From Swiss-Prot:
The keyword Metal-binding applies. Part of the 30S ribosomal subunit. Coiled coil: none annotated. The gene is rps27ae. This is Small ribosomal subunit protein eS31.
Length: 44
């Protein structure tokens, strides 16, 4: 999936960004969100 597919027509997105990297989306799993670049993990 292309990065542009995550944005709506008005330029907003519902996906969360990594607080460490800043320009990377967090991958949503069942019990956590993970940054594929630096490994940052948020447990739910």
């Amino acid at each position: 999936m292309a990065r542009g597919d995550y944005y709506s027509d008005d330029g907003t997105t519902d996906k969360e960004m990594c607080p460490r990297c800043g320009d990377t989306f967090l991958a949503a799993h069942d019990d956590r969100q993970v940054c594929g670049r630096c490994g940052y993990t948020e447990w739910e």
